[in-house]
């Protein structure tokens, strides 16, 4: 089973389900983003969790395959996927990882990799109208985008993934992990993209989601206070500013396209196209 593993809450919980409940071989994938400040911590976290699993559950040594690491900068941009992402973002903004994750899968011929998308996740809300449940050969139920919606941008973007945590939220994961005795392992996970002195910042998107979805205890108290004011004063402005920026970019593109159709006066001769403005 292919699993996108980051060392985070959702993907680690899914790893534990696959290894300790379903007992199936797992190939974990990690896409390294050199611009992300948390990359080193994420890799160290996964290494610690894998070592703990091998020590505590001997059978996982054979089931958990070596992590496969690829670099985001090596992913070739795919025009169809980029167009689908632009279309989806007109309705709901989702992160840049959905530009390179599906492109990576397409580039490497991966047509079923599990993602830890869960209730309260933006992607869960996007996929829900197009979702279908299916029986996985490994003996569990999962969710993916129904091929009957192949004409939609949602299908083009998410067709490579399955979503086994589709019907559970972070608190549900917390309860299930405690019931299984996995609480200590889950506390080893990492989620912050921009750590401050090695601790969660409280301001990045994963920190905000962690707080708002019921796991505020995982963020240091001082950063929770800062996050409170950030979420009430600054965060509400991000979406309208993003929309304004996209609108201005679109208008500039249309003006640039119009100018490229005009004849150039002199220089290269009549009818030569203008260079696009910088």
Residue spans for each PLM region:
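Nucleotide-activated chemistry modules centered on ATP-dependent adenylation/adenylyltransferase
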Residues: 1-4, 9-277
